[in-house]
Structure formats: C-alpha cells, structure tokens
C-alpha cells in the first residue's frame, strides 16, 4: 500500500479517539432495521494534526455496517492508489476528488441489510456473541 497515514476508530462519537483528525477516521453509530439494530460507523476523510496545524476530516454522509468497514477501507485505498496523481498525499487526493467520490465508492456497502439467518452476523458486533443493542449510560466525558 502507498498510504502511510493514520486510520483512527472509536465506538463513541465523542472526539477522544481523534477520528476527526485522522486521514481516515470512524466513530460508532447504529442503523435501525425494523426491530433490530446493526452496529455501524460514520467515516471522516482527510483529517490531520501535524506541526500544530489541525485539519478536521470531512464527515461522509453514509453509515457503514461495522462488518463492512474493512472492505470500505480497502476500496478507498485501492481508489487512492489507482486515481492519485504521482506523489499525491492521501489528504490532497481526498480534497481533490471530494467527499462525494468517497461516498459513491462505498454506497452499496451502506445499503440496508434485511434481518435473516444469512445476514445475522451483521447484527452482532465484532467479538460479541449476542445481537447488538445500543446501551446508553453515564460516560466518562459527561463528568
């Protein structure tokens, strides 16, 4: 791969995981499908923190089911490798092609998943054995 930049991910939408200043960043979300919920992520593209300069990544307008995030990252990296200008850094590429191009590359991955035996794994979060639930509680950030 020709990317040497950062990918940051947090299950929480707060900024502690610094997803918003990563070249590719994700924060946790969910997708409601009838009475069921899919663990999901919202992506940011083009963020950076270097030499005291902060650039917030642009939030994509797609929610990706958690189990489809690795494929989304692979698609974006392949897109970058094949469409970049010689020597073009990832963030410069992201700025040049725009948010919509990144959204279009993964739009089919964000399509709703109907609940069935074949799709059950999408409704279970990574390293868990039971269906995903959004559980809200008092968080550290609220103190």
Regions inferred by a protein language model and the residue ranges of each:
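Peripheral terminal and linker regions in Fe-S/redox and tRNA-modifying enzymes
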Residues: 3-143
């Amino acid at each position: 791969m020709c990317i040497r930049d950062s990918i940051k991910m947090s299950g929480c939408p707060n900024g502690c995981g610094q997803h918003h200043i990563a070249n590719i960043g994700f924060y946790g979300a969910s997708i409601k499908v009838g009475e069921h919920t899919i663990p999901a992520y919202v992506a940011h593209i083009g963020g950076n923190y270097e030499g005291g300069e902060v650039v917030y990544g642009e939030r994509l307008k797609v929610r990706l089911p958690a189990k489809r995030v690795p494929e989304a990252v692979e698609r974006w990296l392949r897109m970058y490798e094949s469409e970049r200008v010689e020597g073009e850094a990832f963030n410069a590429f992201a700025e040049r092609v725009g948010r919509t191009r990144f959204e279009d590359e993964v739009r089919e991955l964000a399509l709703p998943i109907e609940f069935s035996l074949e799709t059950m794994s999408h409704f279970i979060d990574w390293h868990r054995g039971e269906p995903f639930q959004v559980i809200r509680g008092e968080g550290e950030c609220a103190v």
